[in-house]
Amino acid sequence: LKNKKISITTKKKLLKEKEILLAGYNLFVTRGVEKTAIDDIVKLAGVAKGTFYLYFKDKYDLLDQLILQKSNEIIKDGLKKANSLGIDDFRKRTLFFLDYIISYLKENKSLLKLINKNISWGLYRKAMMKPKEYDEIKNVLDIFVRNLTNYGIQKDEAEMTLFMIIELVGSVCFTTIILKEPTDIESIKPILFKKILSMIGV
């Protein structure tokens, strides 16, 4: 009976956290982060303000968790697709994976705006420190770095290469999909992929 009560309490906590995350996401993509107050988030989530602080330090902590959660979901779906097609070659797998993410962001422009303005390498470092919560992110980062080190590249250089690819893809996606400059994403994608292949150099 005691375990059942604990289970119910845990479920309620997870539900409240989920409601706060959902409310935060909806407000961030419609109003923007700066124009969204914690009062707005808790009102939409239907929870007390004190409840918010049980899960998040502030709205930026909520934003970080949202970005990591969404990134984890996209990466998980991308991995499923790659696995279902049986793509094992590192270069082909990398390009397929990036193409999947680009296509997803193209269809979800609000998410692209949110991610592009607030993503950082430090955020992915945070994901590496919480492998249970963001297992897919950690898995992909580990595999990428390990593949490069297998080709004789130093681990530090492999991590910096990954950082540059994340920055490059994010910047190109935002500029071409949102600003539509200097061309559309489909036109620039072959050049982008060519540059990425030269960066990983394997």
Q: At which residue positions do the language-model features occur?
A:
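Short secondary-structure transition hinges
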Residues: 103-142, 178
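Hydrophobic alpha-helical segments that form the core
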Residues: 155-178, 187-199
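N-terminal intrinsically disordered/low-complexity leader segments
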Residues: 1-15
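Hydrophobic alpha-helical connector segments
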Residues: 65, 80-107, 165
